[in-house]
Amino acid sequence: TGVLERVDARRAVLACGHSARDTFAVVHGAGVAMEQKPFSVGVRIEHDQGAVNRAQYGDAAAHPALGAADYKLAVHLPDGRSAYTFCMCPGGEVVCAASEEGGVVVNGMSRFARDGANANAALLVGVGPEDFGSDHPLAGVERAAFEAARSAGGEAYQAPAQTVGDFLAGRASAAGASVRPTYARGVAWCDLRACLPGFVADALAEALPLLDRRLRGFADAGAVMTGVETRSSSPVRIVRDDALQARVEGAPDDAPESGLYPCGEGAGYAGGIMSAACDGLRVARALASAFEPR
């Protein structure tokens, strides 16, 4: 709305989402202690849902009692990295998850019936602090991927995409695929290596054939990868003390309490809906106990 309002409070819960980079910057600028944490970067991969059904159900794939099949895959690579699928959406679609103007970040969802033509899932590679290139809490590996995706996407909010076959062959995609992308804003065919950190792209290329052994057709040449997926968890953690309150950078142990309670995914203490809810309960109890008579 553009309306700014100041509300004074002795205590406040900071439960921002894991995409709230502007909030992270404000909190860091106020002197609150923050640290890097591992997170993941990758793409959304789409397959024909019928092919996934056949791979999972075999001859029973057409049985009316069976719904759209799902999967959960992971592989440990020789260099110590891992690649895995996350938030698999049977009969779903790839959606825009931008949280700022002009942003290009993707996520996935399924409607209640799960009856869409495609299956999709995040295909991710773990990223650790050693990959950041800086010890600054907002070092920005995910930001670099975000900016590259915005550049490669072309038109406003279009997402970069590539077929699995072209990605593994090391060539840019220039036309459509046998699997039609569901991203509503449209895709710009390209080479996704231009949008991803090199080690992420290399890990995906190594992982795809291995994951295909676990789910036949996973590395099908006509499958589509749409970028970038960086929203599986927060890249930072706001440091909390034993009372679950934020700490001011460099403050002594006997410093006055801050009254600020970082909570949930954005604060770096959860990695999904259920774990965020559990952390919310912890923070609510800590906040309530602060008002109990001493």
Where are these regions (language model features)?
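Residues forming the flavin
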Residues: T1-R294
